[in-house]
């Protein structure tokens, strides 16, 4: 039976915090919906102390920002975007339009149609999340989205140059220096100066994730991507240092980021906890990582690989780092995860920044029912049908007529009956089932 050597914060405390977030976000969305640009300006000044003449960057301002980024950093951004673009294109290539004759004269098909306009949120509060621009903007461009707008909060009193560069290189049509719930609301609801989009994508803190949840339906969303989560699955083929490093590597995202170790070795579990404490003494971002580990860190010891799989599927973590003798066992048996990182040679940071898979992934157990952001999220699979012969229309119509009457839909039945009469030459009584 799985046993905890360390538990995270009590669930009731988490629920109370979530309720407070919901209330705050609801108020901000209502304010933006009512007051539009005036609300955006007021909220930006309140939360970010940012009140520019125009939140949208001009071409000259974009070029100025890019000029402030070192050449090597620009080259690294281009390299990372090339990896994301390549994998997204390979994924898109697997999505084929379909047309098939299912019965003589009956043609069914589907087409993959890009969403028309999207808004990409790029976090930049605690850290400038340059990579989030690659994941949303580049992927949307591969999908064929026509209008891509992007928002990121100000960083130290202005646009973050590297984020602007990544947005521009990725293919954003409009770039705004605007953060938080107000940015998401502006893109989704529209203002006097920002035309609304059809879909909001990108990760963010608990407030951004809640804003997306509340806006879903008025616009589409990619998924609910809240504070980062990581699960490290390990056995005694690795040591405590590498496990602790991978746990803290994601815990540093912020004080509410869960980091969990799942192992079948109690010695490794205790070694890892000791290593976490040692590394927190020298880690520059220990303030965030240490708080996350104290409040949301967990260590679970299992008796077998099968039990580890069961626990991992229960947790349904955003990131799952597998460092065992047989990592493919988890690839073949796990069902609930955002993305798997198999073997000690890879790690979550590779996926976060550069390897090419998308880092916008499901959190809070959403991996039970969805995967992460990918090119397919920007494509609507839309079906069509056509009937090309009189015989086919009459034959399908007879079945349809009877099935409609079975459900009590007389007008539905007449849609079928009129075609049975016209194309099949049958005499069917009005609003009655075809015999």
Which functions belong to the PLM regions below?
Residues 1-116:
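N-terminal Rossmann-like NAD(P)+-binding subdomain of aldehyde/semialdehyde dehydrogenases
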Residues 2-7, 174-179, 299-304:
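Short acidic-hydrophobic, aromatic-tinged amphipathic segments that line or gate anion-handling sites
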Residues 94-100, 220, 257-262, 282-293, ...:
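Flexible, glycine/charged-enriched surface loops at secondary-structure junctions
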Residues 101-165:
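Conserved small-residue-rich beta-alpha loop and adjacent elements
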Residues 171-258:
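Conserved NAD(P)+-binding/catalytic subdomain of aldehyde/semialdehyde dehydrogenases
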Residues 223-295, 299:
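A conserved active-site cap/scaffold subdomain adjacent to cofactor or substrate pockets
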Residues 305, 313-435:
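C-terminal core of ALDH-fold dehydrogenases
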């Amino acid at each position: 039976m799985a046993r905890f050597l360390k538990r995270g914060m009590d669930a009731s405390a988490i629920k109370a915090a979530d309720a407070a977030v919901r209330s705050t976000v609801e108020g901000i969305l209502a304010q933006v919906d009512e007051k539009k640009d005036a609300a955006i300006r007021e909220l930006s000044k309140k939360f970010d102390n940012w009140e520019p003449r125009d939140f949208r960057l001009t071409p000259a301002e974009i070029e100025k920002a890019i000029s402030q980024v070192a050449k090597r950093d620009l080259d690294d951004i281009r390299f990372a975007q090339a990896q994301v673009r390549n994998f997204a294109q390979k994924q898109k290539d697997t999505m084929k339009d379909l047309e098939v004759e299912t019965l003589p004269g009956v043609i069914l098909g589907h087409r993959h149609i890009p969403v028309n306009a999207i808004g990409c949120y790029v976090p930049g509060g605690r850290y400038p999340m340059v990579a989030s621009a690659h994941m949303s903007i580049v992927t949307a461009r591969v999908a064929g989205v026509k209008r891509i707008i992007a928002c990121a909060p100000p960083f130290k009193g202005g646009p973050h140059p590297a984020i602007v560069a990544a947005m521009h290189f990725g293919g954003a049509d409009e770039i705004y220096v605007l953060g938080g719930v107000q940015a998401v609301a502006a893109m989704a609801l529209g203002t006097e100066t920002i035309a609304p989009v059809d879909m909001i994508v990108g990760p963010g803190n608990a407030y951004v994730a809640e804003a997306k949840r509340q806006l879903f339906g008025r616009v589409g969303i990619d998924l609910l991507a809240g504070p980062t989560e990581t699960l490290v699955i390990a056995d005694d083929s690795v040591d405590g240092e590498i496990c602790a490093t991978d746990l803290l590597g994601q815990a540093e995202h912020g004080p509410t980021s869960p980091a969990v170790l799942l192992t079948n070795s109690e010695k490794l579990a205790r070694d890892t906890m000791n290593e976490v404490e040692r590394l927190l003494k020298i880690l520059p971002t220990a303030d965030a990582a240490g708080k996350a580990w104290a409040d949301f860190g967990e260590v679970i010891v299992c008796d077998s690989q099968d039990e580890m799989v069961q626990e991992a599927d229960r947790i349904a973590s955003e990131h799952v780092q597998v460092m065992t003798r047989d990592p493919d066992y988890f690839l073949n048996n796990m069902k609930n995860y955002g993305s798997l990182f198999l073997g000690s040679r890879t790690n979550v940071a590779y996926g976060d920044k550069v390897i090419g898979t998308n880092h916008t992934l499901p959190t809070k157990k959403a991996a039970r029912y969805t995967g992460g952001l990918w090119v397919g999220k920007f494509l609507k699979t839309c079906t069509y049908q056509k009937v090309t012969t009189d015989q086919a229309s009459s034959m399908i119509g007879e079945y349809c007529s009877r099935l409609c009457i079975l459900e009590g839909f007389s007008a539905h039945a007449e849609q079928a009956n009129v075609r049975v009469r016209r194309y099949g030459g049958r005499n069917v009584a009005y609003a009655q089932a075809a015999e």
